Regions:
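Residues that define the loop-to-transmembrane-helix transition and helix capping
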Residues: 171-172, 214-217, 266
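Aromatic-anchored segments of alpha-helical transmembrane domains
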Residues: 37-42, 114-120, 178-187, 224-233
Length: 309
């Protein structure tokens, strides 16, 4: 597996003056990168309101998928501009060497985790298939969950975790990012205590995956495959969202600790326990590879020279 060193993602800028130093403070850079991404949000909202929503089916679905893919491309471009202009470094998070293998490895882990949690539900007699949709829906689901997962990886791991990691260290940043990720999903509805715990534990797993490689591919594959399998294929709620179309039409009835209830598999005891085991394992591997940063006040690092335009 290809990995960046944790220090490869630190800013290389050498600011002079008060405003220059202030702009390089990690929490300020979170605001700056958000401003860089504003054009993507404007593009998305304008195209959805003025073009996509006016289209009949099936063109509505096709154009929605196209816009989602363009969203990802635009985020990659804008974030790359941010790292080059503000942090004076290349966006090594998007390095393509070994990308397919990393994405596949992350996806395989999630397929196995969801498969084991789903298997427990089936064995418990709580899962019944009522119907099967056209296979075409799987392509739409792959695009929907793939692009959605990428954007969440960018927001919660590449931006929020990475920049707070640079300031307060990996462990504290991991806890903060996981808590914010869990609370951010409260707007989905159907949030329970077990659902919140499952989300926090799940994000610990995902943040650990990013901390290990310091690239988007491994964690993206893990996040996308989890949502795709849970909702797009198996027809179960995804983080409290129940109205999305799925390949399988199913009925799930059973205790919350087994099924996760209306929130989804991630709220089940099985999925939470498995995520803890795998997340701790990945985090230990990241530590063994020297990918865990200490807080800024406890480390001294010699950074490479900044990029010269």
């Amino acid at each position: 597996m290809i990995t960046n060193r944790s220090h490869d993602l630190l800013t290389r800028a050498r600011p002079s003056g008060l405003w220059g130093r202030l702009a390089q403070f990690p929490l300020v850079r979170i605001l700056i990168v958000v401003l860089f991404l504003v054009p993507e949000a404007m593009f998305h909202n304008l195209t959805i309101v003025h073009i996509v929503e006016k289209m009949p089916h099936p063109w509505f679905t096709v154009l929605l998928d196209v816009v989602s893919i363009l969203d990802v491309a635009l985020v990659v471009f804008l974030y790359s501009r941010y790292t080059r202009w503000i942090e004076k470094r290349p966006a090594v998070e998007f390095g393509l060497r070994g990308a397919g293998r990393e994405f596949g490895a992350g996806a395989l882990i999630s397929v196995l985790l969801v498969g084991m949690a789903w298997g427990a539900i089936v064995i418990g007699g709580s899962y019944r298939v009522l119907g099967v949709a056209h296979p075409w829906i799987l392509l739409h689901a792959a695009i929907r969950f793939g692009t959605g997962a990428f954007l969440q990886v960018m927001i919660f791991r590449v931006i929020l975790f990475r920049l707070t990691d640079e300031l307060i260290g990996t462990y504290a940043a991991l806890a903060l990012a996981a808590m914010i990720f869990g609370l951010a999903h409260a707007i989905n509805g159907n949030l329970t205590a077990s659902g919140l715990a499952g989300l926090i534990v799940g994000d610990v797993l995902l943040v650990a995956a990013f901390a290990l490689t310091r690239r988007v591919w491994f964690v993206w594959g893990m996040h996308a495959a989890w949502n795709f399998c849970q909702d797009g294929v198996l027809g179960m709620p995804n983080s409290g969202v129940t109205e999305l179309p799925s390949w399988l039409e199913v009925e799930v009835e059973g205790p919350w600790w087994l099924t996760g209830g209306e929130f989804g598999i991630e709220a089940s005891v099985t999925a939470t326990a498995l995520s803890i085991l795998v997340g701790v394992g990945i985090l230990q591997r990241a530590r063994a590879r020297g990918q865990v940063l200490r807080p800024v006040w406890k480390r001294v690092v010699e950074l490479p020279d900044p990029l010269v335009e």
